[in-house]
């Protein structure tokens, strides 16, 4: 495989890419004019569609897709069918808030199942998410919100580490002070009364039907933005795209981590 990837990189990566669903097949695998390179030209797809719907259509609706182990030891399993249902519900809610293709959504949440739903639902409708580590403070969060030109913030109110609660709400509230963006709160500590432009995560999830469908986007359409730590200056946003990330990540998981269907 390694030799094949060197001798015929376009044939090699094209074969891996064709394992996925393409709403519109790509016409060319790679266009490389230094320093720019573009993958799967002309193709349209959606990474979340391929992660969920494609597997449901393959007969894996009742197979466990996500296993979540909480801080308190609680375990929760979601099948592909259950996960798709929740993603569609949340995606419907996000669309009703005016979030759509190309919009940036910053996610400032603890390591929870709901955080995964937020990422999947955002990408499902062609929006671009940027996860900010819940250990970062006010200035770091605000800087990333501004740089990404976020339209929406999805934030947790509290995070738990080694059994102790860490207040996220006050950090998030200070970070968005005077900024014109909507906020969805994942509330665990207590259910606060929310002002205009602020919404409850669970109400957005369970208060909407699973009617959203995947937004098919260009292979080079941004999937998410991942910021560097900013230890040597302003944080730099690394952009990953639907086509390349979907194909590259699958290849690495199957080849180097030996992940199999079962």
Question: Would you name each region that the model predicts?
Answer:
Residues 62-64, 184-186, 196-227, 234, ...:
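Conserved pre-ATP/AMP-binding loop-to-beta segment of ANL
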Residues 126:
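Structured binding elements
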Residues 72, 155-219:
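ANL superfamily adenylate-forming
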Residues 105, 122, 222, 228-231, ...:
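Conserved S/T- and glycine-rich ATP-binding loop of Class I adenylate-forming
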Residues 48, 62, 66-120, 137-142, ...:
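Conserved AMP-binding/adenylate-forming core of the ANL superfamily
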Residues 110-111, 140, 154, 221, ...:
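Hydrophobic, small-residue-rich alpha-helical packing segments that form membrane-like cores
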Residues 1-78, 82-85, 89-92, 176-178, ...:
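N-lobe entry segment of adenylate-forming
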Residues 119, 136-177, 248-262:
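Conserved ATP-dependent adenylate/AMP-binding module captured primarily in the ANL superfamily
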């Amino acid at each position: 495989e390694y030799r094949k990837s060197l001798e015929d990189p376009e044939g090699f990566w094209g074969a891996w890419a064709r394992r996925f669903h393409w709403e519109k097949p790509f016409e060319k695998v790679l266009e490389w004019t230094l320093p720019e390179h573009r993958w799967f030209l002309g193709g349209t797809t959606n990474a979340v569609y391929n992660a969920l719907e494609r597997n449901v259509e393959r007969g894996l609706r009742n197979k466990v897709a996500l296993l979540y182990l909480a801080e308190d030891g609680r375990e929760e399993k979601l099948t592909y069918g259950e996960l798709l249902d929740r993603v569609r519900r949340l995606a419907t809610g996000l669309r009703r808030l005016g979030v759509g293709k190309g919009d940036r959504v910053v996610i400032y949440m603890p390591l929870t199942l709901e955080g995964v739903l937020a990422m999947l639902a955002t990408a499902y409708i062609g929006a671009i998410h940027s996860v900010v580590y819940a250990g970062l403070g006010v200035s770091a969060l605000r800087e990333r919100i501004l740089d990404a030109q976020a339209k929406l913030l999805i934030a947790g109110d509290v995070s738990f580490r080694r059994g102790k609660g860490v207040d996220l709400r006050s950090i998030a509230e200070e970070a968005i002070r005077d900024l014109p963006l909507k906020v969805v709160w994942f509330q665990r500590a207590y259910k606060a009364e929310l002002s205009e432009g602020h919404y409850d995560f669970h109400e957005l999830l369970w208060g909407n039907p699973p009617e959203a469908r995947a937004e098919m986007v260009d292979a080079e359409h941004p999937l998410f933005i991942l910021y560097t730590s900013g230890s040597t200056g302003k944080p730099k946003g690394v952009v990953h795209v639907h086509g390349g990330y979907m194909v590259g990540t699958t290849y690495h998981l199957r080849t180097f981590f030996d992940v199999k269907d079962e």
